């Protein structure tokens, strides 16, 4: 779709999703790692954002830009937008850079970090090449366990959630 010159282009996705909101508890929009029109549309359509952060040096620069964009969108376009949290991905606790990134993120965003981290594993890397989610590819893998744990944490963080709903 050519939205570049359309009035209200940042709300196009929001308008498309509106009829679906009553049918689903969650609608997940997986955005590209850029801050283009697709991501802007997703930020305008979303109620919460979950930021996956790879445990790599340049990811820290990217999160700063993303959070600046988040603040601008919240202020000007979508006042109901809420930062659900940041989840560390491709986590390898044996790697010094991973631990440095974790420390820096904990220092900068102490209240926004999920306890669950998504590990760097071969099984997580293999699953997409078979056209499967990690839960369908290997339910007993560390990656599956991590994503299930993250899902429970997400449910617990949502406004109005109760302990019983996460089980």
Regions found by a protein language model. Name each.
Residues 1-4, 96, 137-139:
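Acidic, proline/glycine-rich intrinsically disordered inter-domain spacer in sigma factors
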Residues 12, 65, 146:
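Charged catalytic carboxylate motif
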Residues 15-122:
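Conserved catalytic-core segment of NTP-binding enzymes
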Residues 6-9, 59-62, 143:
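Short, conserved glycine- and acidic-residue-centered signature motifs
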Residues 128-149:
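C-terminal boundary of histidine-terminating zinc-finger modules
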Residues 1-22, 77, 127-130:
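P-loop/Walker-type NTP enzyme "switch/lid" segment
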Residues 104, 149, 154-167:
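P-loop NTP-binding site
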Residues 119, 125, 135:
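Nucleotide phosphate-binding site architecture
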């Amino acid at each position: 779709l050519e939205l570049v010159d359309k009035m209200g282009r940042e709300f196009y996705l929001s308008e498309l999703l509106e009829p679906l909101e009553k049918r689903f508890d969650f609608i997940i929009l997986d955005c590209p790692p850029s801050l283009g029109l697709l991501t802007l549309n997703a930020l305008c359509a979303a109620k919460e954002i979950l930021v996956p952060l790879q445990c790599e040096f340049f990811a820290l620069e990217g999160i700063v830009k993303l959070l600046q964009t988040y603040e601008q969108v919240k202020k000007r376009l979508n006042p109901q937008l809420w930062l659900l949290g940041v989840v560390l991905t491709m986590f390898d606790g044996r790697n010094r850079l991973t631990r440095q990134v974790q420390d820096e993120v904990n220092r900068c965003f102490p209240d926004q970090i999920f306890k669950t981290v998504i590990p760097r594993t071969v099984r997580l890397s293999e699953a997409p090449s078979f056209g499967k989610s990690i839960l369908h590819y290997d339910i007993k893998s560390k990656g599956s366990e991590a994503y299930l744990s993250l899902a429970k944490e997400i449910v617990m963080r949502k406004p109005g959630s109760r302990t019983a709903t996460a089980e």
